[in-house]
């Protein structure tokens, strides 16, 4: 649910940061 979406968002942001 929301946790999956949150983790996906964090992962996406992390990918953009790196």
UniProtKB/Swiss-Prot annotation:
Its main location: secreted. GO terms for biological process: defense response to bacterium; defense response to fungus; killing of cells of another organism. Keywords: Amidation, Antibiotic, Antimicrobial, Fungicide, Secreted. Transmembrane segments: none annotated. Expressed by the venom gland. One of its GO terms (cellular component) is extracellular region. Inhibits growth of Gram-positive (S.aureus, B.subtilis) and Gram-negative (E.coli, P.aeruginosa) bacteria and fungi (C.albicans). Belongs to the cationic peptide 04 (cupiennin) family. 05 subfamily. This is M-lycotoxin-Ls3a.
